[in-house]
Amino acid sequence: MPFIPHTEEDVTEMLASIGATSIDELFDEIPAELKNGKLTQVPTGMSEMEISRLMYERAQKDGFYLSFIGAGAYEHHIPAAVWQITTRGEFYSSYTPYQAEASQGTLQLLYEYQTMMASLAGMDVSNASLYDGASALAEAALMAVRQHKSSRRILVPQTVHPIYRSVVRTIVRNQAIEVVEVPYDPATGQVSIDQLDQFAQEEFAALIIPQPNFFGVLEQVDTLADWAHDKQSLAIAVVNPTALAMLKPPGEWGRQGADIAVGEGQPLGIPLSSGGPYFGFMACKQELVRQMPGRIIGRTTDLEGKEGFALTLQAREQHIRRSKATSNICTNQGLMVTAATIYMSLLGPEGLYRVAAQSHANTLALVEQLETLPGVKKAFHSPFFHEAVLQLSVPADEVLNKLKAQGVLGGVLLENYYPDLKNTLLVCATETKIAEDLDKYTEMLRQILKA
């Protein structure tokens, strides 16, 4: 199929076929007030060299900041080999591998990805990815309701990423599913067990458990998972994959382990890229696999007894079940998964652990240094991973603006999401930061507070 514009002859023939004399007549049913008219702001055409120069000049305006922002998207070192391999022609495609005999390389890579993610999460099975961490959590909520059958209510702690909570509400609200929020303990920054107990006599399909939570704090995951199971609810873990290299996997939480684990895959070799594309991951227990959305790759043998890979359990998917499918996931984020698989393969378990350990150590060191400054203290007294909340004695938004003016992105202003957390910053320091970076942040903040 040639991808070229229609000729005048093509347009005339198509208009004649539908009984219209012009393209304007074709669209005359659109009210005039809704039509944009001429695109007067579109400039004249430019040469390739002119466009390259313009883009370079605009890129220079972005500046190069020292970033201590996390909140769901993290600056990690990505080995050069990751994207050098990912962008090879064999991988660099959005093709869905329906035709197994022609897609063994892609299918094997996806199978290896599933194996790695299932191992990292301590689960039985993983799918081949979802769109992002937020929509993966929404899919997990839908999955829990399908499995539970008798309840259409989901318990969501306020310590879950606020954007994730918003996405979950958006996706489930038209399916008669109620999202009930659980307050956090203002002293610890964790899910309040006392607040949770007020729902003890009510029925819920699932309890969502973040680890670490949006504040960077480590939750009491064993207690929370057991609470959910004691109430015959499913436990849904929403986790940072980097943290899983150090922390107990969801499959080992409490007496039974979490039932579903989801999260954002961006830390696994995906650049920040102004917010995307990223990918979501999902893993679950074997008994829930038929409720799982998205592609699942299986290993099998062909007629000659040779090992091969193919899409499996396809009866769950939209190209077969249509409206009764478990989701409308299409080609999903295959290229991002390719990069993540290569990233995990290159680093291995020991490398992933070093990334996690150094990120934790850097954030711990940063918080300790900043707490020596008058007017700075931790907002919560709980263990954290590679993010922490700092309480300032001065307006935090002004501090961030002054830091930015000096080339430092100092964190996330939490009162935008939590109005009660006035003058608090969520700061993050991954393995990409060195001692000089931490010292620079500390000294700049010292000068700002002194002024």
Curated annotation (Swiss-Prot):
It catalyses: N(6)-[(R)-lipoyl]-L-lysyl-[glycine-cleavage complex H protein] + glycine + H(+) = N(6)-[(R)-S(8)-aminomethyldihydrolipoyl]-L-lysyl-[glycine-cleavage complex H protein] + CO2. One of its GO terms (biological process) is glycine decarboxylation via glycine cleavage system. PANTHER family: GLYCINE CLEAVAGE SYSTEM P-PROTEIN, GLYCINE DEHYDROGENASE (DECARBOXYLATING). The lineage of its organism: Bacteria, Pseudomonadati, Pseudomonadota, Betaproteobacteria, Nitrosomonadales. GO terms for molecular function: glycine dehydrogenase (decarboxylating) activity. Keywords: Oxidoreductase. The glycine cleavage system is composed of four proteins: P, T, L and H. In this organism, the P 'protein' is a heterodimer of two subunits. This is Probable glycine dehydrogenase (decarboxylating) subunit 1. It comes from Nitrosomonas eutropha (strain DSM 101675 / C91 / Nm57). The keyword Oxidoreductase applies.
